[in-house]
Design a protein with these regions (language model features):
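Conserved N-terminal catalytic core of the sugar/cofactor nucleotidyltransferase
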Residues: 1-15, 29-122, 127-134, 140-141
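Residues immediately flanking
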Residues: 11, 123, 155-157, 224
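Short loop segments at secondary-structure junctions
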Residues: 30, 175-178, 224-225
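Short N-terminal binding/cap micro-motifs at the start of the first secondary-structure element
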Residues: 15-19, 161-162
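Active-site mouth loops of central-metabolism enzymes
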Residues: 21-30
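Conserved core of the sugar-phosphate nucleotidyltransferase
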Residues: 129-218
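A conserved hydrophobic position in a structured secondary element of the catalytic/binding core
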Residues: 54, 221-222
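Conserved beta-strand scaffold positions in the cores of enzyme catalytic domains, especially
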Residues: 24, 76-78, 150-152
Length: 225
């Protein structure tokens, strides 16, 4: 019997823009957090287990602020993203303190995922229920095999902008069959009077992005292979 899809949430980031654990900051008058909306939508879509990737340094605060509440409704497992969790033959360079990134975060969760199909998201982005329904459908209907049938939920860039500062997005290129061809990360995109523009030189110059541009917000689905 095939395993049910699990939800993996990358929550190791310290939220430096807000001076603390931004995934634990409420976003509405009722004390709900962005991560609460994601988990609720994922559960409604069919997910029954969530794996939180966190740092040891935030373990207690995370469990108290989020984990214990979620444990009432879903199976919960915690894994740590640590620098020394590396493939055989690799070592941490001397002086390295910065986390390796999202791929490494998933590597740290490999044992907890335990061969199940899984979706992975950021802890601090809002995705919407339809996105979780689509990725769950993909993970429960796609036949795994040598062709690696993985998936990403894409968004219209213009629907992911904010009037308050800038956003970082992965600008996607797809072929005529909606197969992902490439992603180019733009770390500073702003809404300038209804026109999305990005800069790579700290605002000295800006380049426009057209309507219809699709972006990644790090909602991926992977089959066991």
């Amino acid at each position: 019997m095939s395993k049910k899809p699990v939800l993996v949430i990358m929550a190791a980031g310290m939220g430096s823009r807000y001076g603390g654990l931004k995934q634990i900051d409420p976003v509405d008058p009722y004390g709900n957090m962005i991560i609460d909306f994601s988990i609720y939508d994922a559960k409604q879509a069919g997910f029954e287990k969530v794996i939180f990737i966190i740092k040891k340094a935030i373990d207690e605060a995370f469990r108290e602020g989020i984990g214990k509440r979620i444990e009432k409704y879903m199976d919960v497992e915690y894994v740590y993203q640590e620098l020394d969790v590396l493939p055989k033959g690799y070592e941490v360079p001397e002086g390295r303190v910065k986390p390796w990134g999202t791929g490494h975060a998933i590597l740290c969760a490999a044992e907890a995922i335990d061969g199940a199909p899984f979706a992975v998201i950021n802890s601090d982005d809002y995705y919407g229920r339809t996105a979780f329904e689509e990725i769950y459908r993909q993970l429960t209907t796609e036949q795994d095999g040598a062709t690696y049938q993985y998936a990403m939920v894409a968004y219209d860039l213009y629907k992911t902008l904010t009037d308050n500062g800038h956003v970082a997005r992965g600008i996607c290129t797809a072929d005529d069959q909606n197969h992902l061809v490439g992603i180019h990360e733009r770390t500073r995109i702003e809404n300038h009077g209804g026109q999305a523009e990005y800069t790579e030189d700290d605002g000295a110059t800006w380049t426009g992005l057209p309507q219809g541009t699709i972006v990644s917000m790090n909602l991926w689905g992977f089959t066991p292979s």
